[in-house]
Amino acid sequence: MKKYLHISLILMLLSVSGYAQQRVTVRLDNRPMSELFEIIKNQTNYRIYCASEVSDLLIISVDEMNVEPLALIRRMLQNTNFQLSTFQNAIYIIENRTLITTLPESFYTKTRTEIYDVSVNNTVPVFERETKASSETQIYTIGDPNAVSSSYIVLTGVVSNINNGESMPGVTLLLEDPVIGTTTDAFGFYSIRLPSGRRDLVIRSIGMKDSKRQLMLFSDGKLDIELSEQLITLSDVVVVANRIDNVRSLGIGIERVKIQSIKNIPTVMGQTDILRIVMALPGVKSAGEISSGFNVRGGATDQNLILYNDGTIYMPTHMFGLFSAFNPDIVDNMELYKSSIPAKYGGRISSVLDVNSKEGNKKKFQGAGSLGLLMSQLTLEAPLFEGKGSFIFGGRTTYSDWLLGMIPNKSGYSNGSAGFYDLNASANYRFNEKNAVYLTGYYSHDRFNFTVMEQYEYENANFSAKWKHTFNPKLTNTFVVGHDHYSYFTKDMNDIYNAYSLDFAINQIFGKADFSYYLNTRHTLNAGINTIYYRLDPGNYLPVHPKSLIKEDRLLSEKSMESAVYLSDQWEISPLWIVNAGIRYSIFNILGPRVYNIYSSDYLLPSLTAILEADSVGNGILKTYRGPEFRLSARYIIDEKTSVKAGVNTMRQYIHKISNSTVMSPTDTWKLSNLYIRPQTGTQYVTGLFRNFANNTIETSVEIYYKTMNNYLDYRGGAELMMQSHIETEVAGVKGKAYGVELMVKKLQGKLNGWVSYTWSRSMMHRHEELTSSANTSNWYPADFDKPHEVKFVGNYKLTHRYSFSLNCDYSTGRPITIPVAKYWYRGKQYVYYSERNKYRVPDFFRVDVSFNIEAGHRLTKLTHGYFNIGIYNATGRKNAYSVYYVSEDRHVQGYKLSIFGAPIPYASYNIKF
């Protein structure tokens, strides 16, 4: 026995001797410290753990031979706030803290009624070669140990970012045995019912380090949690996400994106774009490049509810669709509901895009800015009232006239100009643990003209005030009131005898109250009420020159009220089965005063020839539409890595976009339902299989859906849509159906991460043959946005901490069009005969974008840190057809193809933080 003991002691001494005698030779000139760490790793058996701000941003120069690495690193860290500590063969570098490697002697003598805190003098304990914050190694006592014991308790609190104090929505909190979980709401608040006794709670969030809290639970209580950003070792790059959500979450057809995870994806002109990311997801399509709207699972562009801090955005883009309306430096997260739409949402039948802004840094002043070829932006944020509140302000503006100046004069668009600006402001204040208020405002203005004689302008504006109140650990609610505005103005003076101006506006005042009640571990109830008051000004058509022959025309304003109540229950039948069932009942009242036409009953549809007389009503309710909307989702876990989900939604929509264009346009007209234009309704059925691989770092999913739509407005042949007091004579309600399969693979971890998806889908429309004389009236015809095949790839490769490469590929079938197929003469006049509607297609779409991102190296003593982004949009230079149109020239019909970006477009932008 002594022999083996002596051998063990000798081996330990040799190991310690070898550990102490490791030497390195280093020659670096003005290089980041990360390169020093790589040299030490290669020449010794040390492992180094640090944050990226040390390894990348600290610039050093060193020329040493046969030097001891620990002494060398300590010299390099002099005059900084970073401390070096070691444990076995690991080196840890942490800001303002050192590490202890043993427990205090009194650790095991504490009683269970105390908080077991092993942190000493701002140090962090290290066990099993891991760096753990003191918050993870202490045991938190929740409740009163002397209270009457209960088998279950309710734990509530707020999860926030340790760096800036901002609350964090969408954070997963999970008890693994037994399996009980929840997620934080939009304010970072959570409520979870847990079995009493000693428990470990795991906390996960996108881009943040996984954390754990050791709890001793006696009775109901509160625990606020702070999460830190993911630490990255030199040898590995990890993209952290809610890895189990793909399998365990209830929702199907839901995409959640944190803005930090998409900033490297290449977009036109180098600006991070929320809508471009949305369009890179499966099941989301657009009519073409720089489209202002998007189509979700066969729905039209007006069937998507776009929310920004609870306010409605009617025009979500700037500058013809080049940029989205959302400032990426202000946005914190977004959720896209393609199905499994919660009962609290309503008003559109296809999807909900809910975008939320940051709250602002609650701990220190911070700013960010960027400079690009077309646009610049600036963001400022800071704490208020000693950290009880915060504010954030951001603005963007463009200087793009130089680009339009490059358009050749022969194009007919000489001397044009275009520009926009938008402003975001938000402030919040937390009075106490139960009450907090949030104020947000948004304004944007676009203007453009292709000649000096034309003018186009449009604007969005939103304001909301929100009060979050916690009645008790089980019951919380949110009250919101606000105002939304959208308007456009056009003026044309090319011909003074026909010079005119045209304007349109829609205003809405809204209010809502949402309640969440945590009944028990199996039931969570959500209920609420909301209402919207609409005032729509359809248009004023006015002469703008003394010689103009235009006759003044002012359409009467329209007023309506939309209200709804809802109730839903999330029921956990067992750890394997979970169901969410909800009902929403909506009511739409058409308000007076109103003038309307009375049509002859001899005609199937309203028409000019069928008008019998005009009638008017005063104030009051002219007509009411109402109906229930059902929501049902279910999930079954097959095993820990596989689940199957299904759901059904029924939706109602009372406002419609009137347009004869495939894409959204600033001059599109919106129309409220009236006596003859009925609300749109839609029903969607969906099911899917979800499975994770490679230790939950690769997510896969297959979703199948079928959707029906009724009363979708399609324009009639020869329709005149502008300034129509009887718009019902120019449009017709049609039926629609859409179905498809979406396949997606996500890689969440490693230097290479991103996703690839394939979608096969169809979107079809149908009119009864009595409604029109078109050739294919009795058949289903493809919708204008029908694209059967679509493949999308988004990838990021992290070369080093400072350098990364991004690639975006997009392929889709060309959208359908109607073309002239013959010409004929009748009574001395030539006519063109068109094909069946949407029988042909434009050429297939294909585009590749690449970008290279450089994180600039700076000394820690500097106040600013920047990064540089360069790339090429449409790297292959393919001339994708935006549209195909035909012009009669010398008695011949000539076809033309319009391409928006027919060549590679290089771009560069510089971003700075301070």
Where would I find each of the regions flagged by the language model?
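Transmembrane beta-barrel wall of Gram-negative outer-membrane proteins
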Residues: 372-397, 410-447, 455-483, 519-521
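Outer membrane beta-barrel strand-and-loop segments of large Gram-negative receptors
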Residues: 508-512, 554, 562-564, 672-678, ...
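N-terminal periplasmic "start-of-domain" segments of outer-membrane beta-barrel proteins
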Residues: 19-25, 47-60, 147, 152-154, ...
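Periplasmic N-terminal accessory/gating domains of Gram-negative outer-membrane beta-barrel systems
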Residues: 117-146, 183, 207-209, 221, ...
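Surface-exposed extracellular loop regions of Gram-negative outer-membrane beta-barrel proteins
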Residues: 487-489, 535-547, 551, 589-613, ...
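Gram-negative outer-membrane beta-barrel transporters
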Residues: 706-708, 727-821
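N-terminal export/assembly leaders
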Residues: 16-112, 183, 254, 296
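C-terminal beta-signal and adjacent terminal beta-strands/loops
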Residues: 802, 811-829, 845-849, 853-914
